[in-house]
Structure formats: structure tokens, C-alpha cells
Amino acid sequence: MKRLQAFKFQLRPGGQQEREMRRFAGACRFVFNRALARQNENHEAGNKYIPYGKMASWLVEWKNATETQWLKDSPSQPLQQSLKGLERAYKNFFQKRAAFPRFKKRGQNDAFRYPQGVKLDQENSRIFLPKLGWMRYRNSRQVTGVVKNVTVSQSCGKWYISIQTESEVSTPVHPSASMVGLDAGVAKLATLSDGTVFEPVNSFQKNQKTPARLQRQLSRKVKFSNNWQKQKRKIQRLHSCIANIRRDYLHKVTTTVSKNHAMIVIEDLKVSNMSKSAAGTVSQPGRNVRAKSGLNRSILDQGWYEMRRQLEYKQLWRGGQVLAVPPAYTSQRCAYC
């Protein structure tokens, strides 16, 4: 079987390379937003969705236009991948797997992708990217498989590279033959049908006073000033640390469960519906809004969907299976009944 795997490392670019990467990310964001604006105009006119083939011709027009000739300075493939990302976003919307595509904002999820033309030199911990040249990265583990694509992204002022590879592996057979049910919760992150309990880490709840204090400090600074930018990076680093704590703990939990059980039965929870606001409208105000807001924070702090995602791919790699069942009446009996 073929296995797709991603390896993420922190980049160590030079000053000029970092400026070029910011420019490339901005160009990809511009292309995405402009294509989305055209799609919206086309939809308002009552026409059907325009596929990628037509959007690619728009990119050629924009490169030849006088006011957007600066797009030629960016590599073509990341710009094309930006349009393919928009097409993928529309397909997810049509299949009711995601919300309607939204415009991208500067500084949020700045990234661009290379589908080919990349050279990886693991011995010297460096990678070659078109129009950027050789760049060093923090080599923390060996990359295995054939490189399929590379994504460069920025987070908290640092640049990262995600290398997706494809490798041929033999069909795995899970060493265990047991089956277990997993009940996700807030007071207890996961309770297994054999009585095993995993306590929650509550990474945001334990640190929620600090983001609030930093956010108040940010509101008192001049927007887009140097001090405002520094304060914003502090907030971003804190939220990144909170997310890393949560993700690390979930990896430990899911690895333990996946190693010991061949089949894992979980609830098919709709987390987005469960964490909706109870505020209501002006004509029909909601009830117990403050209590529901606290419950929503606790639900999102657990990372139920991330736990399910990790279980699914780890079971696939180990030859196990994850079965999602309707959540109704799944928490009626304890493990000893």
C-alpha cells in the first residue's frame, strides 16, 4: 500500500530569502483573493462555478497586465497551486465538508506550495526551492519516501517547511485483536470501555488569563506600530505553545490507544454544532449564554476532532480500524456494566 506522510521542519533562511518568501506568500494570497472575488461576481450574475482551467487563464492575464506585472517575479507553480487550493475549497463546500471559501488575510496562514522542482540534501540539512535557492533547515529526523510536494508556511514570525512524501509499504497487520469503545468528554478527555481513563490537559484553560492580559495590552497600542507588532507576536507565540501542548498530549493518548487495540469505536461527534454560540438574535435572545460560552471553550480545548484524526491515520498505518457510530445513547453504561 502507498503511504503519504508529512515531515515538518523549521527553516533557517537568510534576510533576502525571508523577504522573498513574504513576497511569494503575498502574491499567492493576492491571486487567491482576486480569483475568489471573480467567482463571487460570477455567482451573483447567476452563472455556474468556473473550474480551475479557466482560472489558470486569469493568472496569465494578470501577469501580462500592467498593474499586476509584479506577479512575474514570483514562481508560477505556487501561484497555480493557490488557484488549485481555491478549487479544492469550493469542492469541499459543494460536498458540505466545509464552509464557503473566504478571503485570506495578511499574516494569517501565510503559505505557498511547490509541487516539483525541489531538491533535498538531508546530509547537509538543506533544501533547494525554485527562486529561493538552497536554504538550511533544522533537521530533526530522517525524511523517508519520494518527495511529492513541499509547503512553506509562516507561524509566529518563524518559517517552516512541510515535506510530503509517498512510500510503498507492505499491508500492515495489527498485533492486537481487541476492540474498545472510546467516549470523549470534557471532565475526562477519553474513557475507554475497558475502564481506562485519560485525564484532560486543558492547555487553554490553564493559561487563559495570560492571553486576556496580553490582548488588553495590545488594545492600548497604536495599530501596526512596532510595539503593536511585537505584542501581537507574543500573543501568537502563546497560542502556538498552547496548541503544541494539546497536540503533544493527544499524540501520546492516541498512540497508546492505537497500539493496544485493533478496532476503536468512537462517537461521530459534530464538534462545530456542539460548540455553537447560544447568544441567539435580538428578537430571540438565547439563554444561559455565559455558561454555554464556557462549555464551548472547554469542548474546543479538548481537541476531539484532532484526536479522531490522529486515531484514524495511526490505525490505518498499523492495520487497525476506527469505526464512528451515532452518538445517541453511547454513554449509558460504565465500563464495569
Where are the regions a protein language model picked out?
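Gly/serine-rich nucleotide phosphate-binding loop at the start of the catalytic core
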Residues: 1-79
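Positively charged, helix-rich recognition surfaces that bind polyanionic ligands
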Residues: 5, 19, 131, 139-146, ...
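Short glycine-rich, polar/acidic loop-and-turn segments at beta strand-coil junctions
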Residues: 15, 25-26, 36, 92, ...
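Long, hydrophobic, amphipathic alpha-helical segments used as structural scaffolds
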Residues: 36-43, 90, 94-101, 167, ...
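Acidic carboxylate diad motif detector
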Residues: 53-155, 280, 297, 301
